[in-house]
Amino acid sequence: MDESYQLRLIENPGASRPVGEVYLFSFLVHPVFVAVGHDIAWLRVTGIVALAATAAWTCSEAMHLCGVSDMSSSGLRRSERARTVTAMACASAASMLVFTLGVRVPGYRAVALLGLLLVAGGLARYLTRSRRGGPLLVGIGVWLTFVGKPPSAVAVAVVLLVMLSARRALSVRALGQGLAGAAVAAVVTLLVARLSPADALRYLKGGARLVSLLGDHSSLPQMLGWSRMEVRGLLVFGLPFLLVFAGYLVFSRDTMRDPARDPRVVGALNAVLVLLGLGTGVLGVRALGAVGQGAQALSVTLVLGLFAIAGAAGVLVVGTSEGGFGQRARHPADLRAFLVVLCVLPWAYAVGSNVSLTFSMAQAAVFWVIVLVAVEARSRQAIGGRSHWSALSVTGCMCACLAASVTWVSLHDGRSAIPPPRGAEAVQVLGGSVVLDHDTAVIGHALRAAAKSERMDDRTPVVDVTGMGAGYALILGGRPLGRAHLYGTWSGRVPSARFALSQVPCPDRATAYVIHAPSNPSDVSPALSVGATVDVLEDYDTVLEFTSHQYDKDWRMALLRPRPTLAAKLGCPGAVR
């Protein structure tokens, strides 16, 4: 549902101008989508590469602040280089968690996480001696977070101001550089979007009105990120995880007693334990997915948070005297503040979300992974490889593998799987194609044929009032009206949809094709009545009828063409395509 909505918004960011949205990300992602030929697969790859590279860079900056040798250092030993590369790879893998919950394209969540990673990397540079550009990167990161999720940007700005002010590490010069970075990023965004500051504010205000009418944020605590916790996945993983972890602890203790143990044996046993953890994760996700609860597996990342907090607390307790820990920081206590900020960033990411706090924080668990690998790597380097942090680190990496498996094996709707099921077919969508199961592909081909026979193009208005996903509208083509998708999930679905449609010109509403689900009691077809009562049976002709299987039910749906008389009824006679 969300991915097709965000793809329609990315493909047609200008279509939402009359009404507005609560984020600006589509204006920035749209040029990228155009550059890759409107191909969804290449857009996904671009988002994956951008996030993975940024996460790796942020991890390297954090490790440098902790005192681990820089990758560019000429005197870096092979073991140290391997440790740094491994840590960066862990961070890159963990960043992929943002593509869970059914969205694989770089949507608003991915853009917000990208901004937070820039904030963390810039903060590490600022707190490190002999490094420049940190405040500028922080400012750019805060603005990029705002483009993706404005509430998260406010949250991270407050966290930074409070933490740095408490440490007295915030100078006027640094604040000025940060504001300058944010201002430059804002100007670039507005130029790309072709919006004035007043237009941007009007756009965001309209989006806030839509969300308020829809009622998808039911309370202030939910807006602040303190929503319900879903831990069923953690309970499912509990026993297998403890068995794997217990095996590692026993092995780690024996290794500490015998440092001369063959490193090949150590590596092999570590690999076996991680693979066991990964296998447990895959099996658990599939087991949960069979009953439609695949997303519950994300709660396993709570373990990552607990270990990250334990690692940061250890630094707070033992200080920075151990082996020169934090010696590159401007002040030793700055490192502790940095680790605390990293532990809090997943919550900042969750602020403003309308899903479970567990799921939201899990998508930003990369910051917990960075805490673990940075602290462990420096601790092990400082005391000759015999570190009490190693157990926490490997456990954290194992948890990352468990959680990252959700990205590729997630069965959030209880049916989809990797690889695609037998009989799957490719259906043309925008500039590329999407592989769908046979039944859905048949509908997709029928919609493409209908679009061709009706001579529809990217300027043809299309409204989906099914109250379900926007996938069929995405396959059909055309441009959305009012909003890229009219949600039917919440109680305010009809008022919100009516407000969106009331902001578009009458000729567009009079000539728009409609996708309707008469068997769905939560459809939003009453919202079509703007200025006059519209009856989908009397004012539209049926172009195509089909049955869609969603949410374990069969739904009757239809593609409708407006009759010429609808324009006169709505008050714009003569309106034609």
Positions of predicted regions on the chain:
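Specific aromatic-rich, kink-prone transmembrane helix
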Residues: 98, 111-129, 134-142
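Transmembrane-helix motifs of polytopic, lipid-linked glycan transferases
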Residues: 45-81
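Perimembrane helix-loop-helix junctions
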Residues: 125, 155-187, 221-222, 250
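Short periplasmic/luminal acceptor-recognition loop of GT-C membrane glycosyltransferases, typified by
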Residues: 404-491, 511-523, 549-552
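Aromatic/acidic, Gly/Pro-rich catalytic loop(s) in extracytoplasmic/lumenal soluble domains
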Residues: 511-577
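Short acidic/glycine- and proline-prone juxtamembrane loop motifs at membrane-interface regions
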Residues: 102-112
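Membrane-interface alpha helices of multi-pass inner-membrane proteins
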Residues: 133-150, 156-161, 182-189, 342-351
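Extracytoplasmic catalytic/substrate-binding loops of multi-pass membrane glycan-assembly enzymes
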Residues: 1-8, 16-32, 38-41
